[in-house]
From Swiss-Prot:
Domain of life, per lineage: Bacteria
Keyword Membrane attached: no
The name this protein goes by in its record: Large ribosomal subunit protein uL30
Species lineage: Bacteria, Pseudomonadati, Pseudomonadota, Gammaproteobacteria, Enterobacterales
Complex and partners: Part of the 50S ribosomal subunit.
Organism, scientific name: Sodalis glossinidius (strain morsitans)
Molecular function, one GO term: structural constituent of ribosome
Record InterPro entries: Ribo_uL30_ferredoxin-like_sf, Ribosomal_uL30_bac-type, Ribosomal_uL30_CS, Ribosomal_uL30_ferredoxin-like
Gene Ontology terms describing biological process: translation
Family, per entry: Belongs to the universal ribosomal protein uL30 family.
Keywords attached to this entry: Ribonucleoprotein, Ribosomal protein
Pfam families membership: Ribosomal_L30
GO cellular component: cytosolic large ribosomal subunit
Length: 59
């Protein structure tokens, strides 16, 4: 079974770069406090790194 990480949105996407908003949508995050569980892959890690100032990651 693949490793998973929990990603929680901690800051609003209002006023952010369109690319960063699209990244949040790609991760499946919709609102502040929303948490999703995703596979720990290089692609997901790259998306998390791009919006690291808006999300919290738990291993």
């Amino acid at each position: 079974m693949a490793q998973t990480i929990k990603i929680t949105q901690t800051r609003s996407s209002i006023g952010r770069l369109p690319k960063h908003k699209a990244t949040l949508v790609g991760l499946g995050l919709r609102r502040i406090g929303h948490t999703v569980e995703r596979e720990d892959t290089p692609a997901v890690r790259g998306m998390v790194n791009l919006v690291s100032y808006m999300v919290k990651v738990e291993e």
